[in-house]
Each structure stands twice: as structure tokens, then as C-alpha cells.
A protein has these predicted regions:
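Single conserved hydrophobic/aromatic residue that forms the stacking wall/gate
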Residues: 2-8, 13
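Selective detector of the "anchor" transmembrane alpha-helix that sits immediately C-terminal
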Residues: 279-299
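Membrane-helix entry/capping segments
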Residues: 247-284, 305, 350-371
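"Rare, low-scoring activations can occur
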Residues: 73, 77-78, 82-84, 150, ...
Length: 377
């Protein structure tokens, strides 16, 4: 009976060890990806959306009318935003956003044969200060949308893909794969970037606003960095209340303002990431408790069936502490024996690529860390 009980306990611990490892592995994948730098700093950064009143739009058929009725009012909106006491800096941009599914891609090449699909952001020069993008080489002093070739800031991996090395990439030129006449010159190389906490790094390019932005009267987003002491929970509501009337510069008006922290919360909830992580944590807690109860039950069962042996050992001079440590050692040995087949199952799962690898690679270092965490738990 005792042998059957031990075999049953070992199988129970093996199964729970495997499931606990899988959940810990998932949590580790999310945590490790979240700790990796995104290539920009979103703390104390807010996104403003400006809209326009259809009844106040003036048809612009010339460059002068565009400047008078579109770009000058937009510049006035930006000027008023920058004058707000809590604002450190503000910038306009268009293209790929963070914590959303909105992506803008373009293909780039150096030889018109090999194309590198790249994530694109069109930005004003102040964007690099607002987002605190670290430049590894070069600078953005020549940020001019009328220059030819157009200036561009590329991530290190894009420089590697285009030029086979990021070293010495500043000053080199590349082409728009789909519009061969559109040329770019690398002004700077920046750190690796990704679109959100759990995404993988990918090639990014940041360039000035293209010609169609000015011709088709696109509305850019506005990102602003505020002073840390002003970043309170109600800042967005306070800013909206203070600036709603001031930003009514025909044809524009303030539509909304949102922090990237809130945008991340909404995206995680919409994509199911938050409940997924919560479920994994609850499963880990459940199995930790389950294994603890199983080990305690096994310890209690073995102790009750070995009362005569324990009494004999005490009669022979063994102390209570020594017997306790012996039984605990046997329990740990049982756990070690049960973990051997569990480890084989876990290794097979890694080899079969059925673990969570969307955000983090399944490396042996990750495997050892997760197994160690399960053992400690």
C-alpha cells in the first residue's frame, strides 16, 4: 500500500511540476520581454489627437492657401501646447504607433534587388527629444523635408540589413524599393526599437514628413513630454479642461489626450494579455499549493505508517530533530526523483517548440532559470 502511495505521489508531483514549469516559462517570457528597452522612453509622455471641424475647412488649391489655412493654424496649436506650463517638449509625427495594431511599412533597398521591409515613422525633429531616442552615431541637425536625399534615422538592425554593418552607416544612401526615385541618406543610427513591450525588435526608419503629408492635408499626432512632478493621475483631464478652448484654432480643435501608460493598459486588455498573465499566475499559485499539500500528505502518510520504526530509532538514541531532517530529506529525494521524468517532458516540449516564444527565444538559459524557479517554489 505504501509503495502504491509513493508511486501515486511521484506521478502527481511529476505532472504538477511540468504544468508549473510551463506557466512559469510563460510568465518569464512576458517578464523578460517587458524588461527589454523599447528604444525610446514613454514615461511621462502623452499623445494628443487634433481633429478639424468640417464646416471650417477652407479648400486649399495652392501652396499659399495651404500655409495660410492649414499649416499656420497647426503651428499655432503646437505653439500653445508648448506654452502649457507642464510641457517640456512636443513633437508631431505620423505612422506606426506604440501599443496599437496601427503599422506603416515600407520596403528599402541599396541595389533595387534585395528589399528590407521596415516599420516607418514620419516625425518632426523634436520627436527625438520627446521620446528620448538614443542615437548611437550621427545627429539630426539636417532634418529637412525638402532635402534630397531625405535625411533618415535608422535602427542598428536596419543598417546591418542594408549595408551589412551598422559601423560607418552615417552618410550612406538607400532607396525606397517601390519608388526608386526617392532616396535617403542616413543621418544617424539609433538603438534597436520595437512596437510594444512584448514585441520583438525589428527594423525601423524615422524620416521627415513626406510630400503627400503636405499635399493631402493629413492630421499628424502630437506627442508631448511633461515634467515628472506634473504627471499626476488626473493630468489628462486637467490638460483637456485647460486647453480645450485655447486649442480651438480654426479649423482645428482638441479631440483627446491619453498617456501611453493608459494606452498600454487598454491594448493589453483588448489583446487578452492581461487576463492571460493573470491566469498563468493563478495556475502557478494553485499548483504550488497543490504540490505543497501533496508533499505534506505524503510526509504525513509515511510518518503514520512508520511510527514503529520512528519509535525504534528514538529508542536507539536518535533525536527528534535528526528524525525530522531524515524524513524531510526523503521528501526532497522523492521530489528530485519525480522531477527527473518531468524534466524530460519539459525538455521535449522545448525541443518541439511548444513553449511561449512570441516575445522571447526558447534558450537553455531560460529553461534552467524557469526550472530553478519551479524547484524553489
Amino acid at each position: 500500500e505504501m509503495q502504491r502511495s509513493l508511486v501515486g505521489s511521484e506521478m502527481c508531483i511529476r505532472d504538477r511540476f511540468t504544468l508549473m514549469w510551463y506557466c512559469v516559462d510563460v510568465l518569464y517570457g512576458f517578464a523578460h520581454a517587458e524588461r527589454q528597452p523599447k528604444g525610446y522612453d514613454l514615461e511621462h509622455v502623452y499623445k494628443i489627437r487634433i481633429s478639424c471641424n468640417p464646416t471650417q475647412i477652407v479648400p486649399c488649391t495652392s501652396e499659399d492657401s495651404l500655409q495660410t489655412f492649414w499649416f499656420k493654424p497647426m503651428e499655432e496649436v503646437l505653439r500653445r501646447i508648448r506654452q502649457y506650463p507642464a510641457v517640456e517638449s512636443a513633437a508631431t509625427w505620423l505612422g506606426t504607433d506604440t501599443y496599437t495594431r496601427g503599422r506603416v511599412y515600407q520596403g528599402y533597398t541599396t541595389d533595387s534587388v534585395h528589399v528590407v521591409e521596415t516599420t516607418v515613422r514620419y516625425v518632426s525633429p523634436e520627436y527625438f527629444d520627446v521620446m528620448r531616442i538614443p542615437l548611437l552615431q550621427g545627429n539630426v541637425s539636417d532634418w529637412n523635408s525638402t532635402a534630397s536625399p531625405l535625411p533618415a534615422v535608422v535602427t542598428r538592425d536596419l543598417a546591418d540589413s542594408l549595408f551589412q554593418t551598422s559601423a560607418g552607416a552615417v552618410g550612406r544612401e538607400f532607396l525606397d524599393y517601390y519608388s526608386g526615385g526617392l532616396r535617403y541618406r542616413v543621418s544617424a543610427v539609433c538603438a534597436l526599437q520595437k512596437t510594444d513591450d512584448y514585441a520583438r525588435y525589428g527594423p525601423f526608419v524615422l524620416t521627415p514628413f513626406p510630400g503627400w503629408f503636405y499635399e493631402d492635408q493629413y492630421l499628424p499626432f502630437i506627442s508631448l513630454r511633461i515634467r515628472p512632478e506634473a504627471d499626476t493621475d488626473n493630468f489628462a483631464a486637467r490638460f483637456y479642461q485647460d486647453m480645450m478652448s485655447q486649442l480651438q484654432v480654426a479649423p482645428f480643435y482638441l479631440f483627446d489626450i491619453q498617456s501611453y501608460k493608459d494606452q498600454k493598459i487598454e491594448r493589453d486588455a483588448a489583446e487578452g494579455i492581461t487576463p492571460y498573465i493573470r491566469s498563468a499566475r493563478l495556475i502557478v499559485i494553485f499548483f504550488v499549493f497543490n504540490v505543497f499539500i501533496g508533499l505534506m500528505g505524503t510526509f504525513w502518510f509515511r510518518t503514520r505508517h512508520r511510527r514503529s520504526e520512528i519509535a525504534l530509532r528514538m529508542a536507539m538514541g536518535s533525536s527528534r530533530g535528526r528524525i525530522r531532517w531524515q524524513l524531510l530529506g526523503e521528501g526532497l529525494l522523492l521530489l528530485a526523483l519525480a522531477s527527473i521524468p518531468a524534466l524530460m517532458i519539459c525538455i521535449n516540449m522545448v525541443m518541439a517548440d511548444v513553449t511561449f516564444t512570441e516575445a522571447t527565444d526558447a534558450t537553455w538559459g531560460r529553461f534552467v532559470i524557469c526550472v530553478s524557479i519551479v524547484w524553489i517554489l
